[in-house]
């Protein structure tokens, strides 16, 4: 049964979040041969990923997927893949076959199709989704409900957000296969959006929930 937990953190945000993620991943790995984890882009989770890279996980048993990607070259400093790779994938020496990302060298429709095929061939659900939320309440690159409600697992957007570029994103349908959803948010604007979500305001992040549990890690 889905439930929601909120942690309000004054200090030690990164260490607290990493410990919670480590504990959850270790428990999942005790129960399953392989686990499937969604990672958000953006700035907030990067220090968390950097600390996760120091953990002694059996990385060959963990498959990672990006929640969304900016439609820019993979070596661009705006690329979610590049930024996560620098702090996690390369540091932890995660096998390349366990890292699933959007091939932005393809036309955007083809990139979506390829990423969706890759997801479907790997799993029918995610075990853990580590997500963020924008100050406007967007999640992944779902800035409006029409995008989130697409029937596919993967879709694309017109130029949106900051930087204002086209994006590829998992949809609500994909994200809501996750057993556990962890939202990492910091700052007053995002806290205000969470307050609205708790009052059932239909912002995009409102519609993403873990099948077992949804956890919000809220920092200053």
From Swiss-Prot:
Which top EC class applies here?
hydrolase
Name the NCBIfam families on file. pgl
Name of the molecule in the record: 6-phosphogluconolactonase
The keyword Hydrolase is assigned to this record:
yes
State its role. Hydrolysis of 6-phosphogluconolactone to 6-phosphogluconate.
Species name = Thermotoga maritima (strain ATCC 43589 / DSM 3109 / JCM 10099 / NBRC 100826 / MSB8)
**Pathway it works in:** Carbohydrate degradation; pentose phosphate pathway; D-ribulose 5-phosphate from D-glucose 6-phosphate (oxidative stage): step 2/3
Tell me its EC number(s), please: 3.1.1.31
Q: Which UniProt keywords apply?
A: Hydrolase
What is the name of the gene encoding this protein?
pgl
Which family is annotated? Belongs to the glucosamine/galactosamine-6-phosphate isomerase family. 6-phosphogluconolactonase subfamily.
Give the reaction(s) catalysed: 6-phospho-D-glucono-1,5-lactone + H2O = 6-phospho-D-gluconate + H(+)
What Gene Ontology terms for biological process does this UniProt record contain? carbohydrate metabolic process; pentose-phosphate shunt
Q: Could you cite one Gene Ontology molecular function of this protein?
A: 6-phosphogluconolactonase activity
Q: Please indicate which superkingdom the organism of origin belongs to.
A: Bacteria
User: Which Gene3D superfamilies would you find in this protein's record?
Assistant: 3.40.50.1360
Taxonomic lineage per UniProt? Bacteria, Thermotogati, Thermotogota, Thermotogae, Thermotogales
Tell me if Hydrolase is a UniProt keyword of this record: yes
């Amino acid at each position: 049964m889905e439930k929601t937990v909120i942690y309000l953190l004054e200090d030690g945000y990164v260490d607290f979040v990493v410990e919670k993620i480590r504990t959850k991943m270790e428990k999942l790995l005790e129960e399953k041969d392989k686990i499937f984890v969604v990672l958000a882009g953006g700035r907030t989770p990067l220090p968390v990923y950097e600390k996760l890279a120091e953990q002694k996980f059996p990385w060959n048993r963990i498959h990672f997927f990006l929640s969304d990607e900016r439609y820019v070259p993979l070596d661009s400093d705006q690329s979610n893949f590049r930024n996560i790779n620098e702090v996690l994938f390369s540091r932890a020496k995660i096998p390349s076959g366990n890292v699933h990302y959007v091939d932005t060298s393809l036309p955007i429709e083809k990139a979506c199709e390829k990423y969706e095929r890759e997801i479907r061939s790997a799993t029918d659900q995610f075990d853990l989704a580590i997500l963020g939320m924008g100050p406007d309440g967007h999640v992944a690159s779902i800035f409006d409900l029409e995008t989130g409600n697409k029937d596919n697992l993967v879709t694309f957007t017109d130029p949106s957000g900051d930087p204002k570029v086209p994006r590829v994103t998992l949809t609500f349908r994909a994200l809501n296969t996750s057993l556990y959803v962890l939202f990492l948010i910091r700052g007053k604007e995002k806290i205000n959006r969470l307050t609205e979500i708790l009052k059932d305001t239909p912002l995009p992040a409102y519609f993403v929930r873990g099948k077992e549990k949804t956890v919000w890690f809220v920092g200053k």
